[in-house]
Amino acid sequence: MRAIYFLLYLLFSQITWANERDLMLLSTYENQDVQGWVMSEKLDGVRGYWDGKTLLSRQGLPLPAPTYFTAQFPPFAIDGELFSERNQFEEIASITKSFKGDNWAKLTLYVFDVPN
């Protein structure tokens, strides 16, 4: 029974922690002057949040990225989209769930925010 309580604690603490990151989400801008802003195309990939040590999903769950993939990531938080090419969302999602490191070479983390 203790094991069940412990697992529930881990589950809910991860969800709470994920919400604390306050990720930037898509929104519509109306009547705002966007002159001077930098904008990019919406990439159809998988959200990737690097906290300085671990690559996490939008939900705050660790992604099984191999060491070579994150070796050059900075020691601070970056937020972006794991992407390979258009119309490949299913493959991208599959790779981000896979422990097969060779497939990760197809992906790039396109950074769009540096929180804090």
PLM region descriptions:
Residues 25-27:
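Short boundary/loop segments of OB/S1/cold-shock single-stranded nucleic-acid-binding domains
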Residues 17-23:
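Cleaved targeting-peptide boundary
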Residues 19, 30-116:
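Covalent nucleotidyltransferase
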Residues 1-9:
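Sec-dependent signal peptide recognition
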